[in-house]
From Swiss-Prot:
Catalytic residues as annotated in Swiss-Prot or TrEMBL: T9
Quaternary structure (record): A double ring-shaped homohexamer of HslV is capped on each side by a ring-shaped HslU homohexamer. The assembly of the HslU/HslV complex is dependent on binding of ATP.
The protein, known as: ATP-dependent protease subunit HslV
Species whose genome carries this gene: Enterococcus faecalis (strain ATCC 700802 / V583)
Main location (coarse class): cytoplasm
Gene Ontology MF terms: metal ion binding; threonine-type endopeptidase activity
GO-annotated biological processes: proteolysis involved in protein catabolic process
UniProt-listed Gene3D superfamilies: Glutamine Phosphoribosylpyrophosphate, subunit 1, domain 1
SUPFAM superfamilies on file: N-terminal nucleophile aminohydrolases (Ntn hydrolases)
EC number: 3.4.25.2
Cytoplasm as UniProt keyword: yes
Record comment: activity regulation: Allosterically activated by HslU binding.
One Pfam family it belongs to: Proteasome
Length: 182
């Protein structure tokens, strides 16, 4: 039996030298074995191009959360932290939202946050966040490059290279990578 859920991806966000970059792959997988699309755009700019959001998980759920997050950004005049906290609280307390299976990374030119359905809003200690099926691979690769690699490598290249490494390892991640930088 094939599940009707569409999911799996890898998103990686990196801050270095005051620059923020987020990379995501384009693979949409149905169930555990069927690649339905290889060119999905799961990293995008919102709020007058001032905020970048990346999502992993069930595609329909992720779109719902992205839309709700953008609504919160508008409601709180672009205050990223406030919008993220309000979304997380709503996600946790509204019964209709509790079943949503997705995670978000959101960032502007000042900060990045991970927003989860369990109510967490997490700021990274080291300027790196990664989510999705290949998230741990991308996180490890990005940390290695940022901490031990070429000191001149910018955030954009670290995020992209981390996604490429994750795509080499994770069957739910492909090499069709989109990168957004602030």
């Amino acid at each position: 039996m094939v599940e009707s859920q569409f999911h799996s991806t890898t998103i990686c966000a990196v801050e270095k030298d005051g620059k923020f970059a987020m990379a995501g792959d384009g693979q949409v997988t149905m169930g555990e074995s069927v690649v339905m699309k290889g060119t999905a755009k799961k990293v995008r700019r919102i709020y007058n191009d001032e905020v970048v959001v990346g999502f992993a998980g069930s595609v329909a759920d992720a779109f719902t959360l992205e839309e709700k997050f953008e609504g919160k950004l508008n409601e709180y005049n672009g205050n990223l932290t406030r919008a993220a906290v309000e979304l997380a609280q709503e996600w946790r307390t509204q019964q209709s939202m509790q079943k949503l299976e997705a995670m978000l990374i959101v960032m502007n030119k000042e900060e990045m946050l991970l927003v989860s359905g369990t109510g967490e809003v997490i700021t990274p200690d080291d300027g790196i966040l990664a989510i999705g099926s290949g998230g741990n691979f991308a996180l490890s690769a990005a940390r290695a490059m940022k901490n031990f690699g070429d000191k001149e490598m910018p955030a954009k290249e670290i995020a992209k290279n981390a996604l490429n490494i994750a795509a080499d390892i994770c069957v739910f991640t492909n090499h069709n990578i989109i990168v957004e930088e602030l």
